[in-house]
């Protein structure tokens, strides 16, 4: 059972499909069960044995889990078409984090890089979502600002439904990790899948 944080399939840096292909070539008789879940659910599921492997954005490390860095993504702050900042000129855009306090913010409702940053810069959270889809829906309402992965928001931007707010200023990078339970040691099939994940995300050799 593999559990993945949502909206990773559209990330060009994520090679989870390639890892699955590698694993199936090595272990064709093993059935895979793929789940999409929030970060806290994945961590808890790996710890209690519901999931053998998880793929999550990095935040607070747990000594009960082992972490293998795989890929990253860039998060930008977006507004919807009906938001006052959507049509604002560059000069009218907020210049720093403090200037965002005047606007309602939609954030993830569990411990994550999203929540940590929002608390650190004291954004005015007035709506809570529990996955990227719900955050996108709240932003599209035009009532809230919120962070989304650039690869997920790209189609909405092309359609003219979302706009990044001061992308050079209001952004952060997020690393994703493969996680397994530290103890007891994972089964051989789990370790084999973890090795396939690492291999699929290894930078190509320059030789």
Where are these regions (language model features)?
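Short beta-strand-centered segments that line the small-molecule binding cleft or hinge
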Residues: 19-22, 40-75
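Residue-level signal for nonpolar/aromatic packing positions in well-ordered secondary structure
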Residues: 2, 23, 46, 52, ...
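N-terminal winged-helix
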Residues: 1-26, 31
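General small-molecule cofactor/ligand-binding pocket signal
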Residues: 33-37, 163-165
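Short helices/loops that flank or line small-molecule/ion binding pockets
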Residues: 35, 40-51, 132-143
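Periplasmic-binding protein-like
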Residues: 168-183
């Amino acid at each position: 059972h593999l559990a993945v944080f949502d909206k990773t399939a559209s990330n060009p840096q994520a090679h989870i499909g390639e890892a699955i292909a590698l694993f199936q070539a090595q272990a064709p008789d093993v059935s895979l069960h793929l789940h999409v879940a929030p970060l806290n659910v994945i961590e808890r599921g790996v710890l209690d044995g519901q999931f053998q492997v998880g793929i999550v954005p990095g935040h607070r490390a747990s000594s009960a889990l082992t972490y293998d860095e795989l890929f990253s993504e860039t998060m930008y702050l977006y507004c919807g078409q009906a938001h006052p900042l959507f049509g604002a000129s560059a000069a009218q855009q907020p210049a720093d984090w403090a200037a965002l306090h005047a606007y309602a913010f939609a954030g993830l409702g569990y411990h994550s890089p999203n929540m940590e940053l929002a608390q650190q810069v004291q954004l005015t959270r007035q709506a809570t979502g529990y996955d990227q889809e719900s955050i996108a829906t709240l932003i599209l309402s035009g009532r809230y600002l919120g962070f989304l992965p650039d690869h997920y928001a790209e189609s909405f931007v092309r359609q003219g439904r979302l706009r990044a707010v001061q992308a050079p200023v209001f952004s952060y990078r997020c690393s994703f990790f493969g996680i397994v339970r530290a103890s007891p040691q994972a089964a051989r099939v789990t370790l084999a899948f973890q090795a396939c994940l690492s291999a699929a995300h290894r930078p190509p050799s320059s030789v």
